[in-house]
Regions:
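Terminal amphipathic alpha-helical/low-complexity segments used for targeting or macromolecular assembly
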Residues: 1-104, 170, 176-177, 182-196, ...
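Structural signal for interior beta-strand "rungs" in well-ordered beta-sheet cores
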Residues: 38, 100-310
Length: 340
């Protein structure tokens, strides 16, 4: 791809060789002469003088203090987001030749495929599934009966989607994830045993959601477990039955969310946090890493601590704990004075 075409794609202006052929994307520290990179963080400006990249995307304000005539430059207002556009383009190019349905696919009755669908070897479909235009489904994935998957989705190898689940458009699901497995519902009997509660609901995943590898999203006991539009889930996250995660919320790895909890819009939840069931978290909440959320959160803000509290309170508690040894020393000194 010529540099002038890249500039057109990201709406930038070229300083240097318009005809330079770019074959890939690299880091500023290690990019080669046929690769393009970018600088958006001032910490990386020092690498401009030493990089071997053929071209660099820079902000309009970036001041080139040394003469590097061997490097071509594309000027843009926002190098970071321009680079994201370029990454998306190159990623799509890698998959542009993927099309068609393998002969080694098991298709149930009345399964409907949209246009330009790609299905790899050994994918299994149950009856009455519907797959939208341009969706790509990779090897060894199982999609049970009555599932609907929208357009432009990517479902990577070894994903399992249980019956009756609904997945929107432009959803990405990474390997090993299970969607629609039974919720953890058991009724304790008088004799101390447990009787399984049938999980009759479904999972609904709205548009533009990305789900990392080895996540588990349980079906509802009744109704729906819902992952709303724009949610991003990291790897190894447990979402229990009847949970609702609001739009554009992001959740880091190894978070567990117990049943029937409702999380608001635009929340950010740190890794290894645990959230109890049957509570509500309002919009615009930030939860730190490894936090135990044991009650509803009604006000936006940052919350931290093993026993969750507003961040300022948590800091005060930490300071008090650190001061305990000093207090002990003062108490001993006072005791010694009194005993004298």
């Amino acid at each position: 791809m010529k540099l002038k075409d890249i500039a057109g794609l990201i709406k930038g202006s070229v300083e240097g060789d318009n005809e330079l052929e770019i074959k890939g994307i690299g880091k500023i520290e290690s990019a080669g002469s046929d690769e393009i990179t970018f600088i958006s963080n001032p910490k990386y400006e020092k690498y401009f003088n030493s990089t071997s990249a053929g071209a660099v995307i820079l902000s309009d304000e970036f001041d080139i203090k040394t003469g590097r005539e061997d490097i071509s430059v594309i000027r843009v207002p926002d190098p970071y987001n321009s680079f994201l556009i370029l990454l998306e383009y190159f990623e799509k190019e890698k998959e542009s030749n993927l099309a068609g349905i393998s002969e080694n696919v098991h298709t149930g009755k009345n399964t409907i495929f949209g246009e330009n669908v790609f299905v790899a070897d050994f994918v299994n479909f149950g009856d009455d599934c519907k797959i939208g235009n341009g969706t790509k489904i990779y090897s060894n994935t199982t999609i049970e009966k009555n599932c609907e998957i929208g357009s432009g989705c990517k479902i990577y190898p070894n994903v399992t989607i249980y019956r009756n689940c609904i997945i929107g458009n432009n959803v990405i699901i990474h390997s090993g994830t299970v969607i629609g497995s039974d919720g953890f519902g058991f009724a304790r009997q008088d004799d101390g045993t447990y009787k399984k509660i049938p999980q009759t609901g479904r999972v609904v995943i709205e548009d533009d959601v990305e789900i990392g590898s080895n996540c588990s999203i349980d079906r509802a006991t009744l109704g729906e477990t819902k992952i709303c539009k724009g949610v991003k889930l990291d790897n190894q996250i447990q979402v229990a039955h009847n949970v609702i995660i609001g739009e554009n919320t992001v959740i880091a790895a190894q978070v567990g969310i117990a049943g029937s909890t409702k999380i608001g819009k635009r929340c950010m939840i740190g890794g290894q946090s645990g959230i109890v069931g049957h509570i509500e978290i309002c919009d615009d909440v930030i939860i730190g890493a490894a936090v135990g959320v044991s009650k509803s959160i009604e006000k936006p803000g940052l919350y931290t601590g093993y026993r969750i509290k507003p961040h300022r309170e948590d800091l005060k508690t930490e300071i008090s704990i650190r001061n305990i040894p000093k207090l002990e020393d003062r108490i001993r000194a006072l005791e010694n004075k009194i005993s004298e």
